[in-house]
Structure formats: C-alpha cells, structure tokens
C-alpha cells in the first residue's frame, strides 16, 4: 500500500475535481476514459500538443497548468528529485503493465493521490511495486 511519507498531520480535504493528471507519452491515451470519473480534467500529452516534446517542456506545462505528471518513465522521477514540486509526479512502477492494470491501480489509489496532493512539500508518489512516496 503506498503512503505519503512524512505526513504527521491530517491532510487537507481534496475533492475529486482537484486532482488532474497529465499522462506522459509512455501511457496510453485510452487510459483517460478509464480514470475520468476519479481524475476529471486529466489530459494526455497528445491532447495538449506536447507529443514528442522534451521532458522540460512537459514539466513546465504541468507546472503552469496545475497538473500532476503521471508516468512510467524514470526521467520525471529524476526531475522531481532535482527540482521538487511543482509539478508533482506520480511514478508508476508497474513495468510493462497494460492500460487496464494501470487504470485499476490509479482508481484504487485515488485517496492516496489526494493525500499526496494535499502535502505541498511532497513531490513524488510511487505507485506500484514499491508503493511509497518521497
């Protein structure tokens, strides 16, 4: 079970509408239809004209538009360590898991994601095999 590290206080109440993900290019755009109810306002990089753009450009777009970046790519995890939030990053440590498995993970962990969003000092949430945040 993932957790948000260093959370001694109760997290602020975060509503469903507050959590919007920017899905990295390594995730299927079809994922959006499976998570829409839990993450309204989420987008895939293709939808916002960022397909093929650099990680730096995607990072800046997410920062300016209040998105949490969701990715299986290690590069955004590393950027999180280097630059900190915003934006926040959800690193999906799921190997070659398919769209359905990733959708299930994200929907089952929606409360964890909300708690993560409520902690301004937290920049990285790892969901999947390792199940922790930094």
Task: List where the protein language model places each region.
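Intrinsically disordered, low-complexity and often Lys/Arg-enriched segments
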Residues: 1-19, 133-134
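N-terminal first-folded block
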Residues: 20-68
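Small/polar loops that bind or transfer phosphate-bearing groups
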Residues: 23-24, 71-72, 94
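Glycine-rich nucleotide phosphate-binding loop and flanking beta-alpha elements
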Residues: 29, 76-78, 133
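Acidic, metal-binding active-site segment of PIN/NYN-like and related structure-specific nucleases
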Residues: 63-80
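Ligand-binding "clamshell"
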Residues: 79-88
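C-terminal structural segments of small proteins and small subunits
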Residues: 87-133
């Amino acid at each position: 079970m993932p957790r948000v590290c260093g959370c001694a206080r109760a997290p602020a109440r975060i509503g469903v509408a507050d959590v919007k993900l920017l899905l990295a290019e390594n995730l299927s755009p079809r994922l959006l239809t499976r998570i829409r109810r839990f993450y309204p306002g989420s987008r895939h990089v293709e939808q916002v004209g960022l397909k093929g753009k650099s990680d730096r450009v995607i990072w800046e777009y997410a920062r300016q538009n209040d998105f949490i970046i969701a990715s299986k790519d290690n590069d955004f995890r590393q950027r999180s360590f280097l630059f900190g939030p915003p934006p926040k990053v959800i690193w999906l440590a799921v190997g070659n898991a398919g769209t359905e498995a990733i959708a299930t993970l994200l929907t089952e962990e929606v409360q964890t994601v909300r708690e993560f969003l409520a902690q301004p000092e937290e920049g990285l949430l790892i969901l999947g095999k390792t199940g922790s945040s930094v």
